């Protein structure tokens, strides 16, 4: 299962 959506959240 591969999704073409990558969500990365970086705390500043």
From Swiss-Prot:
This protein is called Unknown protein 7
Q: Which domain of life is it from?
A: Eukaryota
